[in-house]
């Protein structure tokens, strides 16, 4: 799919091409998922797959995340796109006393094509987050804890650190 092969060393991979950055079909790999918790889970799985199969793409700054709006807020003369709760609250504060409508995005597949063209798909206006290699060992360890085979380790991590992520929960 990407054209560059994979970096997995295994006898079972004989039919899969060896990794070659020069064969990459695109200058950027852009992950686009829903802006809710389910979308974040899918994004994490895609990043894990890329990290495990093609870590050089991350190390060479080829992987990006496209943010999609979570809310569309329309007032009399303007439309605002909020990408998180903080931005939504900020826009609503600016519109205090005015009439507006607010629509929560149900997912990329249900967004209006015009809205997607104005936001997520438009190279001039979209928000891209570059996935940076950072501390690759720390990232590898976190991927293994959250998505690896060690169920006890994952439960222990969640029990010890779960409270640190309470503000990020989507309970709507």
Question: Could you describe each region identified by the protein language model?
Answer:
Residues 1-172:
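Conserved phosphate-chemistry cores used by DNA topoisomerases
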